[in-house]
Amino acid sequence: MYTQFMISKKNGKSRIISAPNKKLRNIQRKLAYVLSLMYKPKVCAYGFIDKKDIIGNASNHLRKKEILNIDLKDFFYQIHIGRIIGMLEKKPYCVGHEAAVTIAQLCCYNGKVPQGAPTSPIISNMI
């Protein structure tokens, strides 16, 4: 259901991409849309948020004495299926257990959120 390949990062290292096949990708796109209707981002959130970008985020930090910029290693892969199920079952989402499990299974590859799936950005923001 997934094809894995490597891409180069700016620092010269590689990143593993796990791309879903066409059928699963279409399902995930629709699911990502439904999840986006449920998710209300915090004002401070900028990653993967419509009409927000790196320029807008950076403008919040103009004239600051210090700025910390970090890149979390394997960020999506740190989110496992159990966290997704738990998040969906609790407030504010309150999704039933069976539905939460099904959604989580559709969003995960080998029990984790893959880099390359259409659902990964919204799931990471919801978590």
Model regions and ranges:
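Conserved polymerase palm-domain catalytic core
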Residues: 60-127
